[in-house]
Amino acid sequence: RLSANFKNTIFLLAFDPVVIQDYFKKNLKIDSEFLEKIVQKPIPLPTIEQQYIDQFLDNRIEKLFDELAISKERKEKLNKDFPLIYQTQIRKFFKTLRRVKRYVNGLSSTLPPIKSEVNLHDFLILEIIRNFFPKIYNDIWGNPWSYLAAKWNIGYFFPSPFVSNLEDDKKYEIIKAHIDSITKDEKDSELLKGLLKGLFFEVENALEQHQLGQKYSVETCRVEKRITHPECFKKYFMLKVPSSDISDEFVEATLDLWHLMEETRKEDVISKTIFELQEKSIL
């Protein structure tokens, strides 16, 4: 700046002062206050009100849902279920527009291929974990018995530590120890636990020391495509329907077709559909 005294010229620097000062101190062994000699007129970016961040996120998600032709019924269900966990947990993660854009960009890639097979509430929460807590995201996939009701599916139950039919108290003690262990080094560990409780009632049972079995039945979780149901769980991570499964989208469309069909044709069409699925070894 001093050796280039050009007229009508302004030198504009965009930088993170904390990062620069830390670099001076650790790498150059220079006092962090040396930055003041270089930049005489710092102008920090003004902070943005949280309500504008919330609105920006809401608008971007709504735009994505419109592009994906998400039904009005599903959006209304989300608007009923999502605000509580957003206000108490999620909005604390989104303090900058950069974080919102990163999250929505990820969501724009992961949701489209599986949009009809997942619960929107659960998928939006899981996407936060995938973006900001990748270690936890990988642990959910690698250790599903610490999150799911493993007894609902023998494929998850037999490899689990609970195959010896432990008492619930002992089982939840193991789950709590596991969750505490993997979250302890995370920056926002308590907020993260709040998200996990919002997704997996077994985690809530373990951390809060109460049981929600009556609230979350196997039938309800399957109908609502909740991540905590073993038949839905894989879809959230594979972003596709397993080759051995019939997609929910196909089942729903087929049932709607049968419902609208004339009674005289219904039996033949149903038989034909079942035969085709059997030929593909899916049914």
Model-flagged regions — what are they?
Residues 27-46:
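A short helix-turn-beta junction within AAA+ P-loop NTPase domains corresponding to the substrate/partner-engaging
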Residues 25-33, 219-224:
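Intrinsically disordered, low-complexity boundary segments flanking structured domains
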Residues 1:
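Conserved P-loop NTPase "ATPase switch" module shared by AAA+ and STAND
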Residues 5-9, 21, 47-283:
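The feature marks long, low-complexity, polar/acidic/proline-rich intrinsically disordered regions embedded
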Residues 4-28:
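Sensor-1/coupling segment of RecA-like P-loop NTPase cores
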